[in-house]
């Protein structure tokens, strides 16, 4: 067991975890970008612009646009490791919401040709935000246990659809702007205080599933979905992450309800901020919850 598999685990900034996570786990990440009020920023965990400021500007009418990591940025990001003789396992944001995995694959091919014998593997997480982050963390746990790159890669491919992602939103403005809902639905939704409940399907796309009146009912429903789908129901003993776009009170309500219904959780529910890439599309007022679930593909496809 002395020969450690010499590889680096990397991911995109869109895992929406915090800086402490990356430092503690030694996971380098590559930043998406966004443009707001004519200025370009990296999606860098709230460094260049605080999350509060970012979401306040959207509330005041700013319309940020995002751009993914291109292949030359991936090459720049990975090449120093490959030069040192390290192999790379990269877990990417879902191909269902971004073309970034294609950029990663172009860079992978380029580097493996330039450095014969090097290995770069890319996993399409089919997830987003802290559910995607959860997949990365599980793989980091395996890496720390001494599993090889190949073992980690195979596990991620086999289990990535076992992460369940549910989102709800209390502010429909950005959804209307992004064309996810029609103007008519938007006005009706505002009138009736409707919160759409969305999830990720088996192709990693964000799909509206239910329309629920009032936030409180939506919070109850999102936890009911967890009871229905989590492995072992309320005896679920895995992790649960919650991500919010500047609506901490709502995230705490979900956390409290989850912790009261699931006494055997692994650690407490962890709350993170939705970063600027995903947040450019959701706007403020979105809460995302993720956990592992009972069955693999069947569950996501049943909702698809």
Predicted regions and their residues:
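Short, Lys/Arg-enriched N-terminal segments with co-localized hydrophobic residues
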Residues: 1-3
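Mixed-charge interfacial surface used for oligomerization/domain docking
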Residues: 6, 14-22, 27-33, 38, ...
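Short beta-strand/turn micro-motifs composed of small residues
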Residues: 11, 92, 244
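Glycine-rich phosphate- or other oxyanion-binding loops that anchor nucleotides, phosphorylated ligands
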Residues: 59-95, 102, 106, 153
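Short, flexible active-site-adjacent loop segments at beta-strand->alpha-helix junctions, enriched
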Residues: 94, 126, 299
